[in-house]
Amino acid sequence: MGIKKNSENEKIRKSVDEFYRKISQDEYRTEVSPEEVSTSLGYSTEMMEQLPKGTDLGLSCGNPLENFELKNRETLIDLGCGTGKDLFLTRIKYPDSGTLYGLDRLDEMILKAEKIRDMKKFKNIEFRQGTLTSMPFEPESMDKAISNCVINLEPEKQTVYNELYRILKNGGKFYISDIMLKKELPKEWKKSEKMHNTWVGGALLEEELKKVIKKAGFKNIIIIKDEVTDAYAEKWGYGLKIKEYIQRGMIMGEK
């Protein structure tokens, strides 16, 4: 059973990697632009105009920047940072905070993020290639963590939250935007690689997600629910009625 499960998880990860590699290389496009998705989620045009074209890939389902503040010298990690959009916007908003770290599975994403960082001369932003299930960071090294529509891509969510607990300092907080289920998905959706690639296939019900987070050791868990935007559903829904089954959540907790 364990071997079969691991095999299925690796199949999902491989499919996800291939899908996002295509996106990073601009080989996957839809009629809805990345900018339309971001604007629908509360990213202002003024904010996005401060970043080079191509930084925004339209991979967000929320806006964690609306929910946290960074004090001077506080460190922050973005789990599944992609090309670094949320980190760059955080640096613009908090120029005197500590080092910002981005973690992503794909070298292609890291290379693009580093290129943008160097082009815009952003200071104290470091990117590392690695997985959410084995984060290449020391214990209790981060004050805050964010993530934007990424953790649902990883089959072993308990391991992710365990790792997040490990790297956060005591009193550290996380702010995670992700997709949650309103009700159980159709079986064919759960088995669909493309639904896993776009956060739906791996989504959990709210109570299931809370159990995972509590088991990792977190406290003061708050989940703010909202409908997914029409732009998001149109871009990533494959023409299916995904809004009947999913919602977006702003998930917050403290170590």
Positions of PLM-derived features:
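N-terminal auxiliary segments of SAM/dcSAM-dependent transferases
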Residues: 1-38
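A short glycine-rich, Lys/Arg-flanked "PGG" loop and its adjoining helix->strand segment in the class I
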Residues: 158-173
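Core SAM-dependent methyltransferase catalytic element
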Residues: 232-255
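Short alpha-helix
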Residues: 202-216
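Class I SAM-dependent methyltransferase SAM/SAH-binding core
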Residues: 72-134
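A short acidic, Gly/Pro-enriched loop at the edge of an enzyme's catalytic core
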Residues: 133-144
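Short, glycine-/aromatic-enriched active-site segment of Class I SAM-dependent methyltransferases
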Residues: 180-200
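Conserved alpha-helix/loop element of class I SAM-dependent methyltransferases that forms part
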Residues: 34-75, 89, 93
